[in-house]
C-alpha cells in the first residue's frame, strides 16, 4: 500500500469487529483514499481515520510510512487530547505542592501516614504525620509557599516515586521510531500510567534510519525532561537470537558503525544492546562504554566466558533476562550466571506473565536482589485493542494482549505497562511492595547514574527523598492503579 508517496501499510481497526486489515497491495498500488473509497462503496464508510504510527522498510528514501487506524472514535479523540495536554504540561511553570495522608513506598522502605513537600522541582522534605505533622509538614509548606489549593490529601493512597522504564518501544498506536509525533503520543501513553521517565528504545533498522531516529530523540530532549535518551536494541544482535528484529538489518559492530552511531546520537545514547560473541562485539562494548554509553548484553548466544568478557569490557545491563538468549544449563551456563554473579550488572525483566513465567520472575529477585529492573519492552499496541500492528517494518498480530510476528509467531515485544508490572508483582506474585517499587524506580535509575545529580535529570530520580526530583505517583491502595502523576514537578495526571 502506498500512502502519500511513501511505502506503508494501512491498518484500519474497524469498530464493528474491533479489528480489520487493509494490507499489502496485490498487483497495484493503492493509496488511503482508494482504501476508504472501497469501504464506502460497500455502504460501510469509515470516518475519523487518524495517523497513529509509522515505519519505513529498508531502502525507502522518504519519511517513515504511516499507519492509519480507526477504532473507538471517542477513545481516539480522548487520547489526542491527552497527548496534547501532557505535552503542554511541560510548558507550564511548576508550583510548590504537598501530599499528606499517604503510604510512602520506595526502595528504602514503607511509611504509613506519610507526607511530602516539593518546591515544584525537587522534594524538600518528607515525614510521618504521626510524629511531626503539626510542626514539620506545616513548616515545610510555609517555607516553600505551598498554596492551599496545591495540598493533596491522599486519603490512604500509596505514594511512590515515578516509574522509570529503560526499555520500551511505544504505546497508543505509535512507536519511538515514528518521529516527534510518534514519540509524543507513545510517551503520553506511558506517562498516563505513571512512567514519568523513559529511555526510548529504537528497533533494528538500516543504519541511516537509526541515525536519523537518534537525532530526533536528541532534538526533543531539551524540552522534554521525561525523555532520558535512547536505547538501541539492534542492529548488533545475534542472528540466532534475533527475536522480532529484521534479519536483513543485523550487522557486526565495526569501528566505523560505532563511530557513526556515536556521532549521530551526540550524547543522547544511553544504552545499546550487543551480542558480545559477534566478531567486533567486545571491542564495540568497550568503545561505547568509554564514550559514556551503557552497553547491554542481550539477543545473544554467548557462552559464559564471552558474556563475562562483555561485562568486564563495560556492559552494565542484561537486556530482558531469559528472553532472546541461551538459557541456563548445568554444563553450558551461558550469559545468565555471568550477569547474576556480577554486582555491577543491572538485570532487565519483563514481568507480564508471558515473556517470563512467574516462578522465574521470583527466581530473578532471589538471584540478584536490588538489581532487577522491571522493563516493559512495550510496542505500539500497548494500551490498545487487539489487532494488527507494525514493529519496525514487520507485521505483528496482537491477540489477548500478546504480540507476535505474523510471519513466524515470534514474540514481538509486549503490551505491558510498568503500572501493571508493579501491581502484578505485589498482588499476584507476593513480591514485597518495597522490592517491586524499587525494580521500577531506583534500580533502573541507578543503571545510568540517575540516582545522583547528573547532567540529564539534574536532580536525582528514583526515591521520595529530599533533594530528589519531584517525580511522584499516587496509587489506589487496593489495585495499585495509578491515580495522580507529577513529573519533574509538573502535574500531568
Please name every model-derived segment.
Residues 259, 263-385:
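Active-site core of metal-dependent hydrolases
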Residues 337-347, 365-475:
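His/Asp/Glu-enriched, well-ordered alpha-helical/loop segment
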Residues 157-159, 166, 176-226, 249-264, ...:
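Alpha-helical scaffold segments that flank or form the walls of functional sites
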Residues 188-199, 238-266, 308-321, 325, ...:
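Active-site gating loops and adjacent loop-to-helix segments of metal-dependent hydrolytic enzymes
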Amino acid at each position: 500500500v502506498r500512502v502519500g508517496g511513501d511505502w506503508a501499510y494501512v491498518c484500519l481497526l474497524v469498530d464493528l469487529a474491533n479489528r480489520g486489515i487493509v494490507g499489502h497491495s496485490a498487483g497495484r498500488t493503492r493509496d488511503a483514499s482508494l482504501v476508504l473509497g472501497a469501504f464506502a462503496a460497500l455502504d460501510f464508510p469509515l470516518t475519523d481515520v487518524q495517523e497513529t504510527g509509522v515505519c519505513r522498510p529498508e531502502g525507502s528514501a522518504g519519511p517513515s510510512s504511516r499507519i492509519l487506524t480507526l477504532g473507538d472514535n471517542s477513545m481516539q479523540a480522548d487520547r489526542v487530547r491527552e497527548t496534547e495536554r501532557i505535552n503542554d504540561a511541560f510548558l507550564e511553570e511548576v508550583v510548590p505542592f504537598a501530599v499528606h495522608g499517604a503510604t510512602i513506598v520506595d526502595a528504602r522502605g514503607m511509611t504509613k501516614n506519610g507526607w511530602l513537600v516539593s518546591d515544584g522541582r525537587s522534594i524538600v522534605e518528607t515525614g510521618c504525620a504521626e510524629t511531626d505533622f503539626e510542626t514539620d509538614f506545616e513548616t515545610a509548606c510555609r517555607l516553600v509557599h505551598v498554596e492551599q489549593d496545591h495540598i493533596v490529601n491522599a486519603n490512604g493512597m500509596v505514594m511512590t516515586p515515578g516509574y522509570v522504564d529503560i526499555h520500551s518501544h511505544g504505546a497508543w498506536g505509535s512507536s519511538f521510531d515514528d518521529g516527534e509525533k510518534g514519540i509524543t503520543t507513545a510517551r503520553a501513553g506511558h506517562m498516563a500510567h505513571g512512567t514519568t521517565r523513559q529511555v526510548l528504545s529504537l528497533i533494528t533498522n538500516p543504519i541511516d534510519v537509526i541515525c536519523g531516529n537518534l537525532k530526533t530523540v536528541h532534538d526533543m530532549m531539551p524540552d522534554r525532561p521525561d525523555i532520558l535518551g535512547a536505547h538501541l536494541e539492534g542492529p548488533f544482535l545475534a542472528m540466532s537470537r534475533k527475536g522480532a528484529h529484521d534479519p536483513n538489518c543485523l550487522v557486526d559492530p565495526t569501528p566505523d558503525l560505532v563511530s557513526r552511531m556515536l556521532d549521530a546520537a551526540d550524547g543522547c545514547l544511553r544504552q545499546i544492546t550487543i551480542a558480545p560473541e559477534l566478531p567486533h562485539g567486545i571491542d564495540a562494548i568497550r568503545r561505547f562504554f568509554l564514550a559514556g554509553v551503557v552497553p547491554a548484553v542481550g539477543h545473544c548466544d554467548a557462552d559464559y566466558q564471552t558474556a563475562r568478557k562483555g561485562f568486564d569490557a563495560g556492559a552494565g545491563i542484561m537486556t530482558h533476562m531469559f528472553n532472546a538468549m541461551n538459557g541456563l544449563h548445568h554444563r553450558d551456563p551461558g550469559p545468565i550466571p555471568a550477569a547474576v554473579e556480577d554486582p555491577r550488572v543491572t538485570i532487565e525483566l519483563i514481568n507480564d506473565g508471558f515473556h517470563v513465567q512467574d516462578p522465574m520472575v521470583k527466581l530473578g529477585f532471589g538471584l540478584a536482589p536490588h538489581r532487577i529492573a522491571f522493563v516493559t519492552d512495550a510496542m505500539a499496541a500497548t494500551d490498545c485493542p487487539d489487532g494488527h500492528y507494525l514493529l519496525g517494518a514487520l507485521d505483528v498480530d496482537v491477540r489477548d494482549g500478546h504480540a507476535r510476528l505474523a510471519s513466524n509467531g515470534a514474540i514481538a515485544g509486549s503490551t505491558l505497562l510498568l503500572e501493571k508490572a508493579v501491581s502484578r508483582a505485589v498482588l499476584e506474585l507476593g513480591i514485597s511492595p518495597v522490592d517491586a517499587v524499587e525494580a521500577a524506580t531506583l534500580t533502573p535509575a541507578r543503571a545510568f547514574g540517575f540516582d545522583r545529580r547528573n547532567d540529564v535529570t539534574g536532580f536525582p530520580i528514583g526515591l521520595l527523598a529530599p533533594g530528589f526530583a519531584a517525580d511522584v505517583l499516587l496509587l489506589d491502595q487496593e489495585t495499585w492503579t495509578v491515580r495522580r502523576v507529577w513529573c519533574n514537578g509538573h502535574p500531568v495526571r
